[in-house]
Amino acid sequence: EQKADETLLTKEAELVGIYMEGPFISMEKKGAQNPLYVHKPDAEMFRRLQKEADGLYRVCVVAPEEPGAMEFIDSVKGEVRVSVAHTTADYDTAKEAFEHGARQVTHLYNAMPPFTHRAPGVIGAACDNENVMVEMICDGVHLHPSTIRTSFKMFGKDRIILISDSMMATGKPDG
């Protein structure tokens, strides 16, 4: 009789999708991304990478203030879910990106301008558009508990995706 752990070891993992967090981001808000790989939004580059990845890219991050970003969103929105992130975008630019077809915000509050009473930025634009989902890293490091509670009141539970950010800040090695 085979043990459960032996059965697991004989099966291979299957990659079901890739989250493309870069290279189409703002150099100013690149976060932990390697600056050598930051690139202006480029639909043909995306398609080459998508082909090399056997079509596994499911989400592609873009900073909408970058030159060519709106055209990029228009071009790829039918091929991949476009998410706004690593951005210096103001409210109007983010709103325009959502109108062009971006449907998500990666790492809400992180690597983007803060939400203020006179400059609501990406956060305010996302809140105003019912078609936009937002991701939050609720690890006790990235967001204050009050920010998490307030976000649930702003967006509602059906528009929030809870994620981890598996990188060095979690206290674990890459991988």
Where would I find each of the regions flagged by the language model?
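Histidine/acidic-residue-rich, glycine-tolerant segments that coordinate divalent metal ions
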Residues: 2-120, 171
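Active-site-adjacent C-terminal substructures of enzyme catalytic domains
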Residues: 93-175
